[in-house]
């Protein structure tokens, strides 16, 4: 079993925030946080049969602190705050595979993938803490995909001898 957790933060990070009516660019000064947690593991039932799993959650949030326009010299000129621009994005994936090598070169793999749907959203203004946000993410609707792969090795020489 392995758990990896990475947290990246930037303060007063400058981002493109849109354009004025006259097409002048607007920049935003934001605090950016990106957290990724990955839990993975493998369990061997026998030397030829195992279960592998990988769970990944990524949470990115952007909180706008102020906005500015850019003058002809490239300097920032403070402007009025634009409300409701903060962003909160979650990605969640779970991949599990049961593999059985039932004969040399031959195997059956059963896979299950669980993922957060594209239309699902967690309100970052309410759920500001990581574990609270993760809990809300797990409560949302998820998509599921099941796969079955069958690989069978046929030895041409053994077929040729039987004729």
Language model regions located:
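Exposed, low-structure sequence patches enriched in small/polar residues
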Residues: 1-163
């Amino acid at each position: 079993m392995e758990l990896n957790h990475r947290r990246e933060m930037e303060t007063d990070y400058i981002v493109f925030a849109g354009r004025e009516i006259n097409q002048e660019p607007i920049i935003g000064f934001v605090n950016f946080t990106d957290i990724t947690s990955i839990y993975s593991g493998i369990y061997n039932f026998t030397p030829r049969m195992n279960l592998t799993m990988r769970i990944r959650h990524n949470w990115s949030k952007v909180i706008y602190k102020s906005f500015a326009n850019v003058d002809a010299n490239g300097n920032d000129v403070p402007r009025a705050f634009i409300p409701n621009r903060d962003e909160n994005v979650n990605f969640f994936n779970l991949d599990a595979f049961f593999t059985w090598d039932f004969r040399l070169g031959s195997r059956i793999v059963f896979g299950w993938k669980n993922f957060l749907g594209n239309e699902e959203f967690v309100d970052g203004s309410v759920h500001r803490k990581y574990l609270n946000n993760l809990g809300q993410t797990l409560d949302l609707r998820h998509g599921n995909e099941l796969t079955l792969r069958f690989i069978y090795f046929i030895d041409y020489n053994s077929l040729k001898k039987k004729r």
